[in-house]
Amino acid sequence: MECELIREGKIDQRGFTLVEVMVVLILMTLSFMVFLNALNTGKSVRARSELRTIQSVILSSLENQIRARRFDENLSAPWSSTLGKETSNGESSLTDFDDIDDFNGYSISSVSEHSAFSCDVTVNYVSPTSGFHSSQSGQTDYKSVMVKVSHPTLSAITDTMIISPGL
């Protein structure tokens, strides 16, 4: 009887074949892999963004500390001929710095609270005639302060400030 119904096409078959189930499983697996990859990419972008934010906050903080100092030891020209800490005056740490050029050569290999970050500062005399780009051998009324904040997995952020005595 069943054979006769099959020949006549009267049996109503419902359900999925094994091939259809396998195709659906493969397609679902591929779509989940793409979705998980997108989530992972978003997570790494967020982590990189957080590191960049910390890096820029450290840069801004150090620049504010530099701007808070006087232009030079001398209150008027002629300015100091040597740039850097005056160890003879007892300037050995950041809290002892009293003018901008004390930061020349200042370096932190590991920033407190963010040990993966490091900082370097370079101070030079510059002149407007050179477009503030090349350092001058003598004293001028302008100092170029370059602050660089580095991280092992990111490129360094560097900012250059041109500071004058404001006379």
What positions do the PLM features span?
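N-terminal leader/signal peptides at the extreme start of proteins
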Residues: M1-F16, L167
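Aliphatic-rich helix starts adjacent to a transmembrane/signal segment
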Residues: F16-S60
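Intrinsically disordered, low-complexity segments enriched in glycine/proline and serine/threonine
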Residues: L5-R7, I11, V23, T53, ...
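Acidic/proline-rich low-complexity IDRs
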Residues: E4, I26, F35-A38, T82, ...
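Low-complexity, Gly/Pro-rich coil/beta segments used as flexible assembly/activation regions
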Residues: E50-L167
